[in-house]
C-alpha cells in the first residue's frame, strides 16, 4: 500500500513512517531457522544501523501518530502552523535510527508479517 498520508503531502515535505527495527540475524532466522549462518564481520560500505532522520533535520521535524514530517527549511515553511498541524516538535538532538528506535520486531512477528504479505513479496 502507498503511504496512507498522501493526501497530506505538500511541496518540499518529507514523510518518514515509523517502523520497527530488526536485526539481520532475526531476519535470517525468520526466513529459515535451520539455515547455516557465518559471521564474516563488517564488509566495505556496510552499515550497522540505518538512520532515517538525522539530528541536522531535527530543527524542522515534527512527530505525528505513525510518522514524522520534515518540513522544508526554506521560506520559513518549517514554522508554518498550517504545515505543522497537530505535530509535536522533536527535541533538538533527535535522530530516528535503527539503533535508537524503541520498537523492535521479534522473529515471530516478522514470520507473521512475511506470511501475511506473501502476495506482495513473492515466494522465494
Predicted region positions:
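Glycine/proline-rich active-site loop of Rossmann-fold NAD(P)-dependent oxidoreductases
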Residues: 9-14
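Accessory helical-bundle/CTD segments and flexible terminal tails appended to RecA-like ATPase motors
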Residues: 28-31, 40-43, 47-124
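Short, small-residue-biased leader/transition segments that mark boundaries at the very start
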Residues: 1-8
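Acceptor-substrate binding/catalytic loop of class I
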Residues: 16-19
Amino acid at each position: 500500500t502507498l503511504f496512507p498520508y498522501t493526501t497530506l503531502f505538500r511541496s518540499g515535505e518529507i514523510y518518514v513512517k515509523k517502523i520497527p527495527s530488526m536485526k539481520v540475524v532475526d531476519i535470517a532466522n525468520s526466513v529459515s531457522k535451520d539455515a547455516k549462518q557465518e559471521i564474516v564481520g563488517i564488509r566495505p560500505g556496510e552499515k550497522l544501523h540505518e538512520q532515517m532522520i538525522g539530528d541536522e533535520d531535527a530543527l524542522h521535524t515534527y512527530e505525528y501518530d505513525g510518522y514524522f514530517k520534515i518540513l522544508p527549511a526554506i521560506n520559513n515553511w518549517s514554522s508554518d502552523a498550517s504545515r505543522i498541524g497537530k505535530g509535536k516538535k522533536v527535541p533538538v538532538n533527535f535522530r530516528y535510527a535503527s539503533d535508537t528506535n524503541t520498537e523492535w520486531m521479534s522473529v515471530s512477528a516478522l514470520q507473521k508479517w512475511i506470511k501475511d504479505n506473501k502476495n506482495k513479496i513473492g515466494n522465494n
